[in-house]
Amino acid sequence: MTKRLLILEDGTIFEGEPFGADIDVTGEIVFNTGMTGYQESITDQSYNGQILTFTYPLIGNYGINRDDYESISPTCKGVVVSEVSRLASNWRKQMTLDAFLKIKGIPGISGIDTRALTKIIRQHGTMKATMADDGDSIQHLKDQLRATVLPTNTIEQVSTKTAYPAPGIGKNIVLVDFGLKHSILREFSKRQCNITVVPFNITAEEVFQLNPDGLMLSNGPGNPEDLPEALDMIRGVQGKIPIFGICMGHQLFSLANGAKTCKMTFGHRGFNHAVREIATGRIDFTSQNHGYAVERSSLPDTLMVTHEDINDKTVEGVKHRDFPAFSVQFHPDAAPGPHDASYLFDEFLEMIDSWRCTSK
């Protein structure tokens, strides 16, 4: 059987068995520490352009089902596992992980020492990597990898091109799609909200034409500093209607208010990250997927930190002192992961009710 190579930007080479699509790819290599939820992770648009390493030793044993998609068209570049299950056993499964990746054009590699790979990423940071068959010249692949410039328009690639509705009978929410997870829509649907999903480059004027009760800023991939138009939109909306941001939305909300963001060494990607709510001391276990973070020292007086990571004190949530607006770095929608923080959707809707009363 043909072997598949994983070549890192620092020159490290791993050899493994191929599965999924039979193509060569290059992307940023990252790791996810979740024990389950590989379908949600692979279909999460926040992994756009990235080669996704799973640290859990066996991936694929329950297959792929129709209910756990976070997007219909996944855009991660590749999947790296220690061992892939070629058979799937679950009453909901429709196909194996191998078959799914073949259909979606995503290559995979198994038989990799993912512990060693993760250690490299932790020590040296995320980096470019190439996944290719071993019939190719290794030196040629290394030269190509060094010369590759990864794209920066990742959100433009995954955001909806046109607005569309997710009807409900409750509050009107405009949801800006920076790489939207379907689980966010499901959380609002549970609460009967009337949602309009809009492209990433919508203007403040276009937002108000939709007569919203609140603005939701979704998750998404890439560097938040690449979206100056989104910052202008947020500044034009805040103070007029409540705002809630998640992940990329959190970073954009912070930038729009004068804070700075920085690229993390290896990021937070997994479903077991403990976060402290500063006001109450409450500890929530959260789902996270981000390679950038808000710099605490850069926060203006108008923003207060509401949540922080237990382990490294990363800013995990902020709230505006003057306007009805807040954001969190983690995913309260979970999917996959714990639902400890799903109450934040209720707090957003309660904020809308309070704002209606005070603004009359």
Curated annotation (Swiss-Prot):
Residue sites binding L-glutamine per the record: 46, 220, 222, 248, 251, 289, 291-292
Pathway: Amino-acid biosynthesis; L-arginine biosynthesis; carbamoyl phosphate from bicarbonate: step 1/1; Pyrimidine metabolism; UMP biosynthesis via de novo pathway; (S)-dihydroorotate from bicarbonate: step 1/3
UniProt-listed InterPro entries: Anth_synth/Amidotransfase (IPR050472), CarbamoylP_synth_ssu (IPR006274), CarbamoylP_synth_ssu_N (IPR002474), CarbP_synth_ssu_N_sf (IPR036480), Class_I_gatase-like (IPR029062), CPSase_GATase1 (IPR035686), GATASE (IPR017926)
Enzyme Commission numbers on file: 6.3.5.5
Reactions this protein catalyses: hydrogencarbonate + L-glutamine + 2 ATP + H2O = carbamoyl phosphate + L-glutamate + 2 ADP + phosphate + 2 H(+)
Disulfide bond sites: none
Annotated stretches, region: CPSase: 1-169
GO biological process, one term: L-arginine biosynthetic process
PROSITE patterns in the record: GATASE_TYPE_1
SUPFAM superfamilies assigned: Carbamoyl phosphate synthetase, small subunit N-terminal domain (SSF52021), Class I glutamine amidotransferase-like (SSF52317)
Residues spanning the signal sequence: none
Domain Glutamine amidotransferase type-1, chain residue ranges per copy: 172-358
A GO term, aspect molecular function: ATP binding
Residues forming the catalytic site: 247, 331, 333
Enzyme class, broadest EC rank: ligase
Tagged with keyword Nucleotide-binding: yes
Keyword entries, A-Z: Amino-acid biosynthesis, Arginine biosynthesis, ATP-binding, Glutamine amidotransferase, Ligase, Nucleotide-binding, Pyrimidine biosynthesis
Reported function: Small subunit of the glutamine-dependent carbamoyl phosphate synthetase (CPSase). CPSase catalyzes the formation of carbamoyl phosphate from the ammonia moiety of glutamine, carbonate, and phosphate donated by ATP, constituting the first step of 2 biosynthetic pathways, one leading to arginine and/or urea and the other to pyrimidine nucleotides. The small subunit (glutamine amidotransferase) binds and cleaves glutamine to supply the large subunit with the substrate ammonia.
Assembly and binders: Composed of two chains; the small (or glutamine) chain promotes the hydrolysis of glutamine to ammonia, which is used by the large (or ammonia) chain to synthesize carbamoyl phosphate. Tetramer of heterodimers (alpha,beta)4.
Family note: Belongs to the CarA family.
Protein's recorded name: Carbamoyl phosphate synthase small chain
Gene that specifies this protein: carA
